């Protein structure tokens, strides 16, 4: 579990509160099932790396459990963010796109 999240007591699949969304996103590198990684920074930038090819985007928090991800030139999506908790420890996040329902699960490196 990332050190910055150790004080939180949350359940698996629980929506991430607005107060904790930035901390959840920036707690560490997320690794997805296909090996892609994503890093969020506190200044609202994000880098998604797939097969060694990085792409840069931006993100911002909307409210409880929701954030927006923008990828130039024109892709924007809103996601609901939920905790992944294993044996009482926060191990990652799930992202569900609000418009299409696509779900992605990332685990902290």
Question: Residue spans of the language-model regions?
Answer:
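Lipid interaction determinants
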Residues: 1-56, 62-109
